[in-house]
């Protein structure tokens, strides 16, 4: 769940895509975020009700 969420403060689109603003949370997830784009979208689809 929090795996691909390196940029918590940013919007989901920014969180999924590799951005420079993701400095605070620099984990493996941040690096894997490039591939996580699909995963992120997929996960947010299930939570689309919230957003």
From Swiss-Prot:
One of its GO terms (molecular function) is DNA binding. The keyword Flavoprotein does not apply. GO terms for cellular component: nucleosome; nucleus. GO terms for biological process: chromosome condensation; sperm DNA condensation. Testis. Keywords: Chromosome, Developmental protein, Differentiation, DNA condensation, DNA-binding, Nucleosome core, Nucleus, Spermatogenesis. It is found in: Nucleus; Chromosome. The keyword tRNA-binding does not apply. Its main location: nucleus. InterPro entries: Protamine_P1 (IPR000221). Belongs to the protamine P1 family. Protamines substitute for histones in the chromatin of sperm during the haploid phase of spermatogenesis. They compact sperm DNA into a highly condensed, stable and inactive complex. This is Sperm protamine P1. It comes from Trachypithecus obscurus (Dusky leaf-monkey). The lineage of its organism: Eukaryota, Metazoa, Chordata, Craniata, Vertebrata. The gene is PRM1.
């Amino acid at each position: 769940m929090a795996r691909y969420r390196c940029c918590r403060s940013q919007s989901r689109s920014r969180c999924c895509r590799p951005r420079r603003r993701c400095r605070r949370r620099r984990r493996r997830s941040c690096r894997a975020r490039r591939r996580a784009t699909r995963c992120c979208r997929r996960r947010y689809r299930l939570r689309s009700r919230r957003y």
